[in-house]
Amino acid sequence: MNKFLIIDGMNLVRRIHAAQPNESDITGLKERVNGACRKLLKFHQPSHAAIVWDGDAISWRKALFEDYKKGRKPMPEALANGLVELKAYLAEHQLNSINADSEADDVIATLATKLTSINGEAIIVSTDKGFCQLSHPNIKRWDHFNQGYLTIEEMEKKLGVESTQFIDYLALAGDSGNKIPGVPGIGPKSAVELLKIFRSLANIYNSIDKVGSKQAKKLEEGKQMARLSYKLVQLQTDLPLNVNLKQFRIEQ
C-alpha cells in the first residue's frame, strides 16, 4: 500500500519560525524544518512524502467572501524571502514540494482523497481542524507539535456533533479563526442542539416551521450566510493535480 505523508507547509514552518530566537536566521530555520521532517519520516515510515505550500493568488474563498481570514498576521518578511531557499534545501534532502496556486488546503484534500481512491493511505501533517471533514478511514491527521493523531472521535467529542455534521456545524456556528461568519445569533450550543434534532443544515431549513420562533427568525435572516459559510468551509477534493507519485517516492 502506498503511504503518503502530506505536510501542510506553512502550518508547520510558521510555528517553527515563530519559535526561533532570530527570525532572520534562515539557515537555522532550514535545519529546524528539515529536522522536523526527518522526525516525521522516521516515525511514519511513508512510501511517499511531499510538503504542500500556499500560493500567492487570491483564493476562491477570499473572492467569494472578502472578510475570509481577515486580520491574520502577514507572513514575516524574512520568512517570505527565505521560502525559495528553504524549499530547495528540503528537496536536496528528499522532500519535494507541491506549490498550490492559492490555499494549500484544497490541494492537500484532493491529494489525500485521490490516494484513498487507489487504496492508499494519507497522513496529513497539520493542526488545521478543517481536515477532520475528510473522514475516510485511510486519511489520518497528525499534530507534529503535540506528537499525536487528531482523531475524528476527539473532534466529535470537542464539537458535540458527528463527523458527517462538521461542515453543517461550522456553517451554523461559524469559525472565528478563519472569519467564517456562520448564522448571526446561532452559536456553538444552538448549532449542536439543532443538529441533534434535525441532523443536517438542509433538514433544519426544510423544517424551519418546527424550530422555535426566535431561532427560526435568526435562521431565516441568516440563510444566505449559512449557505456562504457552508461553501467556505467545504474542502475541494477534485482539483486537477499535475503530479506523479514517482516524484515523491522516499528512498529507504
From Swiss-Prot:
Keywords: DNA-binding, Endonuclease, Hydrolase, Magnesium, Metal-binding, Nuclease, Potassium. Its cofactor is Mg(2+); K(+). Its EC number is 3.1.-.-. Mg(2+) binds at D105. It comes from the Bacteria. K(+) binds at L172, A173, P181, V183, I186. It is an enzyme of class 3 (hydrolase). CDD domains: H3TH_53EXO, PIN_53EXO. Disulfide bonds: none annotated. Binds 2 Mg(2+) per subunit. Only one magnesium ion has a direct interaction with the protein, the other interactions are indirect. Binds 1 K(+) per subunit. The potassium ion strongly increases the affinity for DNA. One of its GO terms (molecular function) is 5'-3' exonuclease activity. Belongs to the Xni family. Has flap endonuclease activity. During DNA replication, flap endonucleases cleave the 5'-overhanging flap structure that is generated by displacement synthesis when DNA polymerase encounters the 5'-end of a downstream Okazaki fragment. This is Flap endonuclease Xni. The gene is xni.
